[in-house]
Amino acid sequence: MQALINNVTHSFTSIFGYAPTHFIQAPGRVNLIGEHTDYNDGFVLPCAIDYQMVVAAAKRDDNLIRVIAVDYQNAQDQFSLEHPIEFLPNKMWANYIRGVIHFLQQAKYVFQGMDIAITGNVPQGAGLSSSAALEVAIGQTVKTLYQLPISQKEIALNGQKAENQFVGCNCGIMDQLISACGEESHALLIDCRSLATTAVKMPESAVVMIINSNKKRGLVDSEYNTRRQQCEEAAKILNVTALRDATLAQLQAKKALMNDKVYRRARHVITENERTLQAAEALKQGDLTKLSELMAQSHISMRDDFEITVNEVDTLVEIVKSVIGSQGGVRMTGGGFGGCVVALVTPDLVAKVTQAVEAQYKKQTGLKETIYVCSASQGAGYLEITNGIK
């Protein structure tokens, strides 16, 4: 974190010519269990991770917004709050910021201009929600600078709106909500229908490992939309608002009315919701054996019923599983078709898992993995800088 603060301060000071007054952070996230349940009004169990976006900021006394993207060679954007905020097709990173500010304005929050510089170490394209962290960081920055009466939940919803309607990417609410509302040493059980959140204490004996398969994610959008349609079709046949409301018994009773794919997609969602609720309970009890079982079932369900895993990801899961047995859990995390696996393991197994993956993964797939060892972290907020800038 200190390196990020130093970096962002250096860019801010050298380009704007004065020192920032505030620092804000917003974390990335990993979803421990509850995959493709969010748009079915179901449950998810993510935690915020100690990889984050950091913003250095200061108020202006006019209506100008000036932005520096430190990680894009200090690229800059500038726009006025007095004119309609436009989408920039040739500067994608800037649209996340423009979108957040546009919707804050639309919600009638009152604020003026600001100078901001942004940096981060949330890996991009790994499915760890760097875009949601950016949206939440900007919302949090405006809230902090201008003491806006906006809740963390509203910051999350505003970020989601920016991504869906301004940037033009479909996403559920989980990523923004965990970035805005995460708690240190806790996962967050989120009800994606009511947006109610319950903090679930992580066992001290559990370390979060994220292993990126580095398999480029192809077909994500088209396959995501197909899965979504299949889930909606199943809900219609079952005569429920969303698959969150269906039981396995209801699904079995209507099996003859749906094709096999639609049936299996629905079976994944219904069982995954149940697993997610059980996993929250197991986590609370510190029952890693039960968690191991639930995460294994989740992966099999994603592989066989939802069909969103790929060989490289399945290979990683098998390698990790062979090391940890029932002393932790492992499964694919994220939208699918590549991306990362998440493992919850005891501290003594981190080195063994790392060794096994480094020795076997490339040999079996031709790809080199990237490993992140994380801990469940605090959601977005103001950073008190007590030790000065180094």
From Swiss-Prot:
Its main location: cytoplasm. ATP binds at G125, A126, G127, L128, S129, S130, S131. It comes from the Bacteria. Substrate binds at E35, H36, T37, D38, Y224. It is found in: Cytoplasm. InterPro entries: Galactokinase (IPR000705), Galactokinase_bac (IPR022963), Galactokinase_CS (IPR019741), GalKase_N (IPR019539), GHMP_kinase_C_dom (IPR013750), GHMP_kinase_C_sf (IPR036554), GHMP_kinase_N_dom (IPR006204), GHMP_knse_ATP-bd_CS (IPR006203). One of its GO terms (cellular component) is cytosol. The active site is at D175 (proton acceptor). It catalyses: alpha-D-galactose + ATP = alpha-D-galactose 1-phosphate + ADP + H(+). The keyword Kinase applies. Keywords: ATP-binding, Carbohydrate metabolism, Cytoplasm, Galactose metabolism, Kinase, Magnesium, Metal-binding, Nucleotide-binding, Transferase. Disulfide bonds: none annotated. Mg(2+) binds at S131, E163. It is an enzyme of class 2 (transferase). One of its GO terms (biological process) is galactose metabolic process. Its EC number is 2.7.1.6. Pathway: Carbohydrate metabolism; galactose metabolism. GO terms for molecular function: ATP binding; galactokinase activity; magnesium ion binding. Belongs to the GHMP kinase family. GalK subfamily. PANTHER family: GALACTOKINASE-RELATED (PTHR10457:SF7), MEVALONATE KINASE/GALACTOKINASE (PTHR10457). Catalyzes the transfer of the gamma-phosphate of ATP to D-galactose to form alpha-D-galactose-1-phosphate (Gal-1-P). This is Galactokinase. The lineage of its organism: Bacteria, Pseudomonadati, Pseudomonadota, Gammaproteobacteria, Enterobacterales.
